[in-house]
Amino acid sequence: STIQIDGDVVTRLLKGRDTAGNSVVIGVHKDAVDVSFRYWSFLIDALGRFAGKAVNTLVGDTG
């Protein structure tokens, strides 16, 4: 698995390793997807807060 700087997680599998009996690989993939989802959720939330504060500053809202 590779975690890229933009938050994407890439898991590459060799042919024949992606069987239902290979629970370790499936677990690694699930964890990678979970990490990526949390990263993007955090990033979008942070950008939303930043944009909200920027707008409040521009319009003079002190709250």
From Swiss-Prot:
Domain of life: Bacteria
Name of the protein this chain belongs to: Uncharacterized protein in nodG 5'region
Biological source species: Azospirillum brasilense
